[in-house]
Amino acid sequence: AAPANAVTADDPTAIALKYNQDATKSERVAAARPGLPPEEQHCANCQFMQANVGEGDWKGCQLFPGKLINVNGWCASWTLKAG
């Protein structure tokens, strides 16, 4: 189950960024970002994910302050993590 502070589908930022906690159900193919093939883009390899915040599949994100995103998610701001 999602934690209480997880980003929800009706969150205005989530809507604006087309965030979906399940990347396979997201618009990542239609709105793919440069860096990796669309099917390899997800929050876990995005530079905005904060690996030291949250636990398990739920981590922090610089784009959603104080909230948690699913590492298997995707949004239109996905950017390949350096390194």
Curated annotation (Swiss-Prot):
Specific class of high-redox-potential 4Fe-4S ferredoxins. Functions in anaerobic electron transport in most purple and in some other photosynthetic bacteria and in at least one genus (Paracoccus) of halophilic, denitrifying bacteria. [4Fe-4S] cluster binds at C43, C46, C61, C75. Homodimer. Signal peptide: none annotated. Thermostable. Belongs to the high-potential iron-sulfur protein (HiPIP) family. Keywords: 4Fe-4S, Electron transport, Iron, Iron-sulfur, Metal-binding, Transport. The keyword Transport applies. This is High-potential iron-sulfur protein. One of its GO terms (molecular function) is metal ion binding. The keyword Protein transport does not apply. The lineage of its organism: Bacteria, Pseudomonadati, Pseudomonadota, Gammaproteobacteria, Chromatiales. GO terms for biological process: aerobic electron transport chain.
